[in-house]
Amino acid sequence: MDEKDLATQQAQAGQDPRLPGPDEDQERAEGAEAQAAEGAPPPHRVIPPHPGLRQDGGPGKPPRPSLRWDGGPGKAFPKPADGATYAKEAAEKGMTPPQLGAGQAGGPGKPPHPGPDRDGGSKASRASSPKKAGGKGLVSLKGDRAFQRLKKGRSGRGRLVLVRWLPRQEGVAVGIVVSKKVGKAVVRNKVRRRIREILRRLHLPPADLLVIAQPEAKDAGFAELARDLFLALKKSGLVQ
């Protein structure tokens, strides 16, 4: 072995194995140049958020609805317009607005439709109607003179009630007499309420009417009392 070969072997033995050799450096340089020529690798695709939606799902995931309407964070849903504003905007856009319900404005220049109150009638008709006592179309017969006059009226008797009546111009004025012979206050009130309810369901002509409950009425049911009262009214000639 000559001195030249010995020097070459010593140089190779003393080289650090962690350092790249000249061939590796050349390959890396060529790879970097090729990559630069081809361009940078494409990035991950991100789905753009839809207007009015907030992107929370991350790359490649569908957007998640936001609780806030479009225009950016911090803008709440638009407030609904009232009937008049909606009708005006619809007319400007050539749209036919839906029929407005009771109590809503009928559009520009139109008065609002009166809405029903809790008992089913309008407030205007309720204010103009006369005050009723008890059942529908019935008013209370008041004053001793009115009761005294009915002694001369036409009468009809049943097993449970006695009726007397006189004609009047309009409406039905009713007096109901339930004595202590019928029972205690609770029983008397029950009989009185039943008689008034029966009269409310009948279509009576205008009259001053007196109904006197008999002691047997305390044990009668509603249907039995209704039949007996109708029979007494028929006997008196008030109903046919």
Curated annotation (Swiss-Prot):
Ranges of biased composition (kind: Low complexity): 122-132
Catalytic activity: Endonucleolytic cleavage of RNA, removing 5'-extranucleotides from tRNA precursor
Residue stretches of biased makeup (Pro residues): 40-51
Protein's UniProt keywords contain tRNA processing: yes
Region (Disordered): 1-140
GO biological process, one term: tRNA 5'-leader removal
Superkingdom of origin: Bacteria
Region of interest (Insert), residue spans: 47-123
Keywords: Endonuclease, Hydrolase, Nuclease, RNA-binding, tRNA processing
Enzyme type, top EC level: hydrolase
EC number(s) from the headed UniProt entry: 3.1.26.5
Keyword tRNA processing attached: yes
CC per GO annotation: ribonuclease P complex
Role description: RNaseP catalyzes the removal of the 5'-leader sequence from pre-tRNA to produce the mature 5'-terminus. It can also cleave other RNA substrates such as 4.5S RNA. The protein component plays an auxiliary but essential role in vivo by binding to the 5'-leader sequence and broadening the substrate specificity of the ribozyme.
Other noteworthy facts: The open reading frame (ORF) for this protein entirely encompasses the ORF for the 50S ribosomal protein L34 (rpmH). The two start codons are separated by four nucleotides.
HAMAP family for the chain: RNase_P (MF_00227)
Assembly with partners or alone: Consists of a catalytic RNA component (M1 or rnpB) and a protein subunit.
PANTHER family for the chain: RIBONUCLEASE P PROTEIN COMPONENT
Family in the record: Belongs to the RnpA family.
Name used for this protein in its record: Ribonuclease P protein component
Lineage, highest ranks first: Bacteria, Thermotogati, Deinococcota, Deinococci, Thermales
Gene designation: rnpA
